[in-house]
Amino acid sequence: MEKLTTLTGVAVPLRRSNVDTDQIIPAVFLKRVKKSGFDDALFYAWRRDPEFVLNKPEYKQGKILVAGPDFGIGSSREHAVWALHDYGFRVVISSRFADIFYGNTAKNGVLAAIMPQESIELLWKLLDEEPGREMTVSLEDRTVTCGDVTLPFEVNDYTRWRLMNGYDDIDLTLQHEDDIIAYEKMRAEKFPFKPKTLPVKREPEQPIESAREGEYPDWQGPLADRGII
């Protein structure tokens, strides 16, 4: 996962509260089997309106989303964060986030920065005065700077540490790779009758044998060949 320490980019004012995950990405797009390519689905219904903020040329390259309170409520679809990230947003600022959405942001390289609603209103005012304006978010200092205005934001220490180091869940697990390998080696020696759980890439290719073939001496082949299915 890409590290996030300081980000300077176009800030987009989203003057809407109670934005739920179905508004961020409709359920119809959840049928996709990949984790990327959801940028076209972000705010899909709203983007059909020519006046929607993301349809304005000055916000096409938005990287920082300044949203209203209670952002990311609703169902716990991780796709909502994927869509924001794929579109280009690395930071979402709000006065309140849904808990599950907040947790998903850190796992996917997106900062959910919490600021008082008064600070959000001030940022909206500054952005309305100069559409397409850039802001700087410093995760190291926990500040947002827009022009001459610098405001603090909240982020817990653990989330800050993950984002600044670019650690997703797999990265965190691999920090204990030596311990995992040692345990699996011990497990294989002590309990040889149990299946191994090492990654497939560490195992030689094994021939696949039918369990039925060993269980039934009269096994004649696939069920289809025997007229059973």
UniProtKB/Swiss-Prot annotation:
It catalyses: (2R,3S)-3-isopropylmalate = (2S)-2-isopropylmalate. One of its GO terms (molecular function) is 3-isopropylmalate dehydratase activity. The keyword Glycoprotein does not apply. InterPro entries: 3-IsopropMal_deHydase_ssu, Aconitase/3IPM_dehydase_swvl, AconitaseA/IPMdHydase_ssu_swvl, IPMI_Swivel, LeuD. Residues 200-215 have a biased composition (Basic and acidic residues). Pathway: Amino-acid biosynthesis; L-leucine biosynthesis; L-leucine from 3-methyl-2-oxobutanoate: step 2/4. Pfam families: Aconitase_C. Residues 198-229 are annotated as: Disordered. One of its GO terms (cellular component) is 3-isopropylmalate dehydratase complex. One of its GO terms (biological process) is L-leucine biosynthetic process. Keywords: Amino-acid biosynthesis, Branched-chain amino acid biosynthesis, Leucine biosynthesis, Lyase. Its EC number is 4.2.1.33. It comes from the Bacteria. Gene3D superfamilies: Aconitase, domain 4 (3.20.19.10). NCBIfam families: leuD, PRK01641.1. Heterodimer of LeuC and LeuD. Belongs to the LeuD family. LeuD type 1 subfamily. HAMAP family: LeuD_type1 (MF_01031). Catalyzes the isomerization between 2-isopropylmalate and 3-isopropylmalate, via the formation of 2-isopropylmaleate. This is 3-isopropylmalate dehydratase small subunit.
